[in-house]
Amino acid sequence: LGFATPSFIPKVAHVHCQGTVDHTKKRYEYRGTMSCNAAQNLFSGPNSCTYGCMGYGDCAVACPYDAIYMANGIAHVDSSKCTACGICVKTCPKYLIEIIPKHSNAYSVKCKNKWPGGQTRKNCTIGCIGCQKCFKTCQYGAITMDGPLAIIDQDKCTHCGECEIVCPTGAIVNGLMLGQDDNDQPKTTGTPRKAALKQEA
């Protein structure tokens, strides 16, 4: 009938944080309930970056598809299992998880902090410092600045990779839609905690 069929673009959950135990420090020893929401209520959590993933796995527990696992202190998404249902997005108290187009070569600013660059460097060695190098380099208008934080518009990004090249801290990464970063790290999904919660009930 002359109508074009819209192409379906699969989506996937994406965690905007790389603040593993190798890149951040602890401000204090948290001894409360092992829950992100609980830890958030105590001085925004124990990590030096108060914007980053706390690693207690509320998102992994909430995911009905076991698509989220914890490794090296932060959450990771296995896109082969993720259905982009969005439950994890609503669960994260730091608002770190976003549903984005699923592209094996996607580029992303894996950071959500809003500190000035100097403060960011003190709290996380791989965070966005707001230098604007990526913003000035992008020829396609795909990168904007939200204060000191660079943001990539996935709909405009052409995956040229220039932003990753100029990023001085490694905050911009590529190809993490497959959920295979830190594959050599021990993984834990939310399944054990789910079982424990069922037993308590």
Feature-to-residue mapping (PLM):
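Ferredoxin-type iron-sulfur electron-transfer modules and their immediate structural context
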Residues: 1-137, 166, 170-173, 177-201
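Strongly charged, low-complexity linkers/loops
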Residues: 133, 139-151
